[in-house]
Amino acid sequence: MENQNTKKPLVNVKALSMMFKVRGTLFKALDEIGFTVNEGDFFGVIGESGSGKSTTGKCLIRLNIPSGGKIEIANHLLSGKKLTKENNQWLKQNIQMVFQDPYSSINPTKNVLTVISEPLVISKTVFGETKQYLKSLQKLSFKVKKTLLRNDIELETKFHNNFFKTVIKQINESLFNFEDLDYKDLKPSHLRQRIINETDKFIEKIRSEFALFYDFYANQSVPLQKALDDANSSLTPSSVIELKNQLKALQKQAKISKAAWDILQALKQNQKELKDYENYVHFELQKKPRIYLNTWLLTTKSYIKDSKQNMQLTDDIFAFSYNSMVDKKRNLVLILSKYYKLLPYFYDQSVFDNADQFDEIANLIFFDLVETLLGVTSLFNDALAADKVPLIKFAKFLNKLCDLRFLTLKKSFKKTRVSCSFSFNSEPEILFANSCYDLQQMPQIIKPFWEKLFNEQNYQKIIDSVSRLNVMIANYITKAFEIKKTIDEKLREFKQQNLALKKAYSANKKSEANKASINELKVNLKTLKKQLKQEKNTTKKQSKKELKPLLKEHHTALKLHDEFNHDLRKWFKKLNFMVKKYNRLENSQKKFCLVKKLKALFKKQDETLQSELRPKLKTFGVINFEYKRAVKESNVFRLVHFAKNIFKPFLFFNLTKIFMRNKVYEALDSVGLKREHAYRYPHEFSGGQRQRIAIARALITKPKLIIADELISALDVSIQAQVINILKDLAKKHNLTVLFIAHDLSMVQTVCNRLIIMHRGKIVERGSVDEIFSNPVHPYTRSLIKASPKLSKINVDLASFDENFTYDSDYSLTNMPFYIKVPNSEEHELYCTQKQFDSWIKEATPIN
């Protein structure tokens, strides 16, 4: 197993929650789950239906908006109600999802070409590539353009020679086979079959050459890259590219003095640094931290919703009081977050630091009340009937005391322009307590809790916690204003430098002392122009000599199309001749009577030889269509390469369509489909082929993460293996990270390296695949593995899955589960209580 510590984390999920509204209540589909996926991982997610697997995947790609928690993928925060424009664009390009039903992502009314290219249109990646292609053309020198023309002609000539020479040869072979056919000695049925077989054989050979069309389409942009490579490899100081660059620089430099030129360059550099610094400050110290802050607040609000719902649904006074206290604690955290509005700048990491510290201090402020309530709850279970009433009354009292403490802190919160602070006074609580209970008549069962709660040491701890909170807020505010001071000084320094450089530039621009250097530059300018002209003339002469034989060969190659049409007409004449011979031979062997003549009159049209051959001969129409398109696209590239710049924007969308189609061809090749499949519709494919199309659609934007949601569940075993092998090969080739959601444990064990097991919206076990399958500990995991069907004992296995799990029935306010690491393992962890862990570890044995 590869050491996971050497890999970079790609996906970081923390406290992810997803709640759905169901008839006025909130159903928690995901309950604060967290996991990390490293780059290049094949990460498995397994569990029964309804465990939250698909919901997790949909939250990552934002088909479901998470109710709370943090989702960070490649340092892009993707949780929260809204995404920034940049993060939204990044998400569309770098995360894709493949569903169990291919029709979830495939539109059945559109052909495969349109379906697969949809992500390119949505993410707009292909538009950027087209712009880059057109930009590279603007920088070409005269010499490189001539090289590009030569490469264009060579490509077109090669295509005509390869395709039409081969096809003409096949036509002649087919004509020879027809000539060699001795139809006089054959029966009509045998002759018919020979004609059909020969036609099928010829058409199949023609179809096998269609790949040359697709190669020609894909290679249209190759000449430009080849020309640029040739230009870069032969770059010399006297080359056209170098001369043009020098010419542009000197034209600008000749207008001003040398000193002014140097100052101008320094001014531009200073302005660029200023702009970069302002962008950094805006994004890293303002925009990005606010995004993290909003995510944290959303998570806190979802926790508050959860607490309020638990309060409404429970009929247990102790659970009600506990959830009420949790609600007050989280509302206090919301009040604390208000101080962020004072901060002009802060780091995103400070949000997480504050979140942890706020939670810790809020827990300390309410800890005495929560601890007392848990003690009362624990005592209530074993108490006598007479003691239960005062315990219930005391639980209600603790809840009201918590409300009072929260209101006291809320009212004491003071916020000014430069500070925020709380204050705490124990007097209101003591007065309230004395009004509720008489110390002399207080039940004995409550007295220990009362004495522990209402003493100076306890209240001093609360005052210390509040003071610590105030100090922490003051420190962060001070730090934020120090950052502001540093930024203001830096910006002021940049602006002062700009002013100084502008003044120096104005003073040196018309300096008489630089006349000599300006004259020298002008002389150099004239020399360079002469060099440029000479270089152009030399290139023209050389290119004429080089292009003559190429143009002659190209002209000869173009004539092959006419020769192909001529030979094809001959082949059709021969085929018609053979069909007529067959009809005569068939008629000569029939003895016609009136009844047979009437039968022949009403004979179905599709039973004749002509009707059987007609659909087969449509292939030649396809050749004509593909050739016309090849010529049209060749002309588009010729115009893009050599037309004036003013006309190129009108060709932008034509060029984009060509690039898009070529990418679709590459995607189809990568999943083992043919390029001609791009023009079919989804219903014309099998289930496995449709799933391949869905994978091609997901891969076309070259994403970093693919979420495979029960990708192979609906396919038969052999097709499952094919699809998984394709996905594994592509993941290895493109360094993809795959989140593999599945029911099939044997497949997960084969392809995944890390794994989480989900049940009822929680991760109950997680770790490496080898560690979990060699030593499954959690009862749910063991039941899943036992129920995995094996041919040797299928009757036993299918009946062994236990649906009525009660492991979580013991969880309570005083017995909360947490993650515990399994001994002698690297990352194998269980979600359980310590008592359960000790029991399960003893009982855990390998499952065969």
UniProtKB/Swiss-Prot annotation:
This is Oligopeptide transport ATP-binding protein OppF. SUPFAM superfamilies: P-loop containing nucleoside triphosphate hydrolases (SSF52540). InterPro entries: ABC_transp_ATP-bind, ABC_transporter-like_ATP-bd, ABC_transporter-like_CS, Oligopep_ABC_C, P-loop_NTPase. One of its GO terms (cellular component) is plasma membrane. It catalyses: a [peptide](out) + ATP + H2O = a [peptide](in) + ADP + phosphate + H(+). It comes from Mycoplasma genitalium (strain ATCC 33530 / DSM 19775 / NCTC 10195 / G37). The keyword Nucleotide-binding applies. Part of the ABC transporter complex OppABCDF involved in the uptake of oligopeptides. Probably responsible for energy coupling to the transport system. The keyword Cell membrane applies. It is a peripheral membrane protein. GO terms for biological process: peptide transport; protein transport. Belongs to the ABC transporter superfamily. Pfam families: ABC_tran, oligo_HPY.
